[in-house]
Amino acid sequence: DVDYWLNILPKNKELNNLSTSNNNIQIKKHNFTPIFIIGVPRCGSTLIEKIIASGPQYVSIGEETGILSTLVKQKIIEQKAIYFNIKDMRTELIQRYKEKNLIQQNSNYIFTDKTLDNFFYISLIKAIFPLSKIINCTREPLSSIMSILKNNLPNLPWAHDLDHIFRYFDI
């Protein structure tokens, strides 16, 4: 829904005012080090993810999981705000990443999540996964906008109207 992406989510102040006083997250004595790739669609994020995956260390590839955005949207809809326990949220997120087979021992608990709209959740990501890395993938905006229009992205409700696209880029 366009209203959610352009109005409700960007105005949610709780997402930007989270405590980051959590200790390192450990499960079975292993630290989780996700790599979040953020940006706008058609910004080159797939190339970045492939470069990361081609390195010598095994890294589980998350593509666009939408795990965090789905969970946050669920919390916003259920509670009209997202006051929640970070530890509970962490447990729920780790379980969802495990269900997608992203958290694997042979990857040394490093995985990528290329859900580009995770830029809305940077404070939340750092509170839940303090060891995480965040890569902001950028491209000349006009090139991204033209590519978004040309590719007719069906899963992005805001990507089919030029005014909506400009508003999304202004967030």
State what each model feature region is.
Residues I61, I67-F84, Q105-F111, T115-I171:
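PAPS-dependent sulfotransferase catalytic domain
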Residues D1-N106:
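Alpha-helical solenoid repeat scaffolds of the TPR/TPR-like class and their adjacent stem/linker regions
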